[in-house]
Every structure is written in structure tokens, then in C-alpha cells.
Swiss-Prot record:
Gene3D superfamilies: P-loop containing nucleotide triphosphate hydrolases. Disulfide bonds: none annotated. NCBIfam families: GTPase_YsxC (TIGR03598). The lineage of its organism: Bacteria, Pseudomonadati, Bacteroidota, Bacteroidia, Bacteroidales. PANTHER family: ENGB-TYPE G DOMAIN-CONTAINING PROTEIN (PTHR11649:SF13), MSS1/TRME-RELATED GTP-BINDING PROTEIN (PTHR11649). Residues 22-197 form the EngB-type G domain. GO terms for biological process: division septum assembly. Its cofactor is Mg(2+). Keywords: Cell cycle, Cell division, GTP-binding, Magnesium, Metal-binding, Nucleotide-binding, Septation. This is Probable GTP-binding protein EngB. Necessary for normal cell division and for the maintenance of normal septation. The keyword Magnesium applies. Pfam families: MMR_HSR1. PROSITE patterns: G_ENGB.
Amino acid sequence: MEITNAEFVISNTDVKKCPAGTFPEYAFIGRSNVGKSSLINMLTGRKGLAMTSATPGKTMLINHFLINNSWYLVDLPGYGYARRGQKGQEQIRTIIEDYILEREQMTNLFVLIDSRLEPQKIDLEFMEWLGENGIPFAIIFTKADKLKGGRLKINISAYLRELRKQWEELPPYFITSSEERLGRTEVLNYIESINKELNSK
């Protein structure tokens, strides 16, 4: 898939105010500071499309970007940023859950995982919750360029082992690096394949 057009449409905290229409939506979510904004900018080829920050927890809104005038890329708030405080975390959780459970246009959720880390309980519990609610999702391992030698393979294998404890069939997964544009083609082709399937119905 070639992205010829990517434009910001709207930010909000209320799923009912998300764009009308039937365009499929591909949402991106992950723990704070997982590299979500950098990944979105890399995928779209637009350096400043999503705001990047070294400070975790900056994305507090549901952000819609219209891609090729045919589908939406949705940037969801990051989860698990403790310094927001309990009230702030609850507000973010409500925004995330409302979008994921109520937004009919959401076609696939991409869960971003920092490939530098061992399996994190918060990520595994979030994916288990997705499974319990029948939410279609794929995993994107980020920051692959930060690991040397066989560490990347070891970390991903550890995650897959943990997932197999919960899942009979593993969700699709992709390995990416925003710095090296690794995985861009694979993720976009995956989105394109789903769009083609939807259009054939």
C-alpha cells in the first residue's frame, strides 16, 4: 500500500463524537512511551503527523487521521502511566474502553509492545481483556533497532510463550523500527489486505 494522503481530522475524549461514516478504522494503542507517535509518523511517511514526546502519557485523546480518503488511522491514549494519578488513569481507561467496545467502525486494533522489555503484566492482561471481549487485534513490536545480537529474538519468543498460555492461536505480529522504517511494508500490506476483504463483501 502506498499512502498518498494523510490528514488530521479530529481529537476528542468522547467516542460519540468520532467521525461519522463507514470507513474502517485501525487503532493503535500501547503503554506510555512505547513509540506510538513515531510509528504512526513512520507508517504514514509524515514526520509531524502525530505528536512525539519524550514525556510518557502525552496522548490523552482519541486522534483520527484520514488515510488515502478511504480509512482512518486512530491514535489512542497510552495506558499504564502511573504519574497521571488514579483519577487520571481511570479517565483514560474509560476513553479507551468506550472506543474499543463501542466503536463499530474499528476494524483492527494494533497493540504496541516495546521489544526491549521482558513480557509486561499490563500488556498481557490488556490482550487477555481484548480476547475476552472478542476484539480483533495484532501486535506490533517497536524499537527493534535498539537491541543487539539475538536479544530481539529472545524477547519476542518470551512474549509468544506467555501468549500461548492464554491463546490457542496467536494473533498476527509485526517487528518494527521507526528509525529504520522496518516493518512498514508488512503493517501497511496487512491493513490493505483487510480493506480488500471488506470491499469484496
